[in-house]
Amino acid sequence: MTKPFKGVIKLDVRDSKPDWTPYELKKAPAGAPNVLIVLYDDTGLASWSPFGGRINMPTLQKLADSGLMYSQWHTTALCSPSRSTFLTGRNHNVNRCASIMEATDGFPGAAGRLPAECATIGQVLQDNGYSTFWLGKNHNVPTEDTASGASKSEWPLQKGFDRFYGFIGGETNNWYPTLVEDNRYVDQPSTPEQGYHLSKDLADQALRMLRDQQSANPSKPWFMWFCPGANHAPHHSPKAYADKYRGKFDDGYEAYREWVLPRMIEKGLFPSDTALTPINPMPKAVADTVPGDAVRPWNSLNDDEKKLFSRMAEVYAGFSEYTDAQVGRIIEYLEQTRQLENTLIFYCAD
């Protein structure tokens, strides 16, 4: 509702008094913190080193050592619903996001379009004096709206974000991604032969946005939603990072479970009497109805299969650590510009 005019209008401008207050944008409170959320994809609690896992995460470890590590964390185990709840603070069914965007069905809880009453954190903060940035994955646009000529009503700039750079959908090629900047598709800035990787590109763009913010309006707080392609398939890691894990997973996935559980108990993440679930928790009669829906015992694999699955784990781990290094560049910039102490950082996965 428009605020009433409180100025004075006389016959002569010299006797009149303007009133700009109805048009002033709301400012954030003095000292309001910046907020950075780093949201990985498809990553289990037992993967990362701060939680006892084998994947080295120096940036996350640094933040965990000086912060708080949560042991209670709920996701829907699907991209779109989890991200909708994070963006709005509301149940995913209330958000009409019961499943991924490719599975919307037109029913009230799964229509894929956010109700107007479900404001995003971007909209709330934007209306209260924040700059808002979204980088990386956006799996909250209905499939029929992903084309360049389709409706943009569910795209980030229409959901409270000043800037967006990333991709729309569940996954993309990290060497040759389908990129979107704001409301348009764009070409990637370089090739893999020139050193391109999506995780690095996202960090580059995040730093560019933050530098622009600092030069244009350094007193204005910002919110950044940083969602890399990691660790969702396709798993694309620079070879040097994948090779750091050569042989680290040769003992197999069953042995890894046995190895990591005591470490997680020691860190206080699980009660001391926690036992492993069966590697195939579903009854065999049920699992057999869905081809590939059961894990084969490691010792039943032949040598080529073991070699393949070990390498897949190495690439996954390298992908994760490489992306963590890119997040580290953002943290380093915040340290250099003395913003870190006034920045809330959440480092998590769906």
Each PLM stretch: what is its role?
Residues 1-350:
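Formylglycine-dependent sulfatase
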